[in-house]
């Protein structure tokens, strides 16, 4: 499975960008993924319905992800709860080839991974399924992954119940990206070093303009 290289701006959802920005602030300290206990984004409780927490077992040839907790919206999309279940068993053999490699990429690279796929609800309406994966370390190895899932339908309403199991139509991948560029969070309104800034005199006198660079 191929992944493009992307900057944080690839993430569309404002809520997911907030989650990613909190992760980036922690990452920027030492250029490594943070520990999960450090991760305390604002309004986390509001997002819990759309989050899945995974623990990562690395004793097998490929990482094994197990679900200790999940949001209720996500369990409705898959048609069952996943608490205590491995990712492979949770999504099932039909969806595993489309889903599991995305998580493995996140674990292997210890970087955020973002994906978008079109799926059909039980009435045939096209729904964009946007998934953001955030890795967390313990003793230098990825031990946890948080998945944030957002759904969007251009036609308006859709049926989330059994969204990932409603019919035989498989997800149609639109984007798979490893977020490995611009791994920092720039606060709104801040000017980055080396950005050119122009200063002009006020009207009423001969107008001159000076351009400087911030270093």
Can you name each region flagged by the protein language model?
Residues 1-81, 85-89, 97-215:
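Intrinsically disordered, low-complexity terminal regulatory regions
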């Amino acid at each position: 499975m191929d992944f493009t290289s992307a900057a944080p701006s690839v993430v569309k959802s404002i809520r997911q960008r907030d989650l990613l920005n909190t992760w980036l602030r922690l990452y920027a300290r030492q250029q490594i993924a943070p520990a999960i206990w450090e991760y305390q984004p604002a309004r986390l409780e509001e997002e819990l319905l759309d989050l899945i927490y995974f623990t990562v077992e690395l004793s097998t040839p490929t990482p094994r992800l197990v679900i200790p907790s999940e949001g209720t919206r996500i369990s409705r999309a898959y048609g069952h709860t996943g608490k205590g279940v491995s990712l492979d068993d949770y999504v099932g053999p039909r969806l595993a080839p489309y889903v599991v490699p995305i998580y493995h990429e996140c674990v292997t690279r210890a970087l955020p991974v973002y994906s978008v796929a079109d799926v059909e609800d039980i009435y045939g309406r096209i729904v964009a399924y946007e998934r953001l994966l955030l890795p967390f370390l313990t003793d230098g190895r990825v031990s946890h992954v948080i998945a944030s899932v957002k759904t969007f339908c251009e036609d308006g309403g859709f049926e989330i119940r059994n969204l990932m199991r409603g019919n035989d139509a498989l997800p149609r991948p639109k984007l798979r990206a490893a977020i490995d560029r611009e791994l920092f969070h720039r606060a709104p309104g801040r000017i980055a070093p080396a950005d050119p800034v122009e200063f002009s005199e006020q009207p009423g006198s001969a107008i001159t303009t000076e351009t400087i660079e911030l270093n």
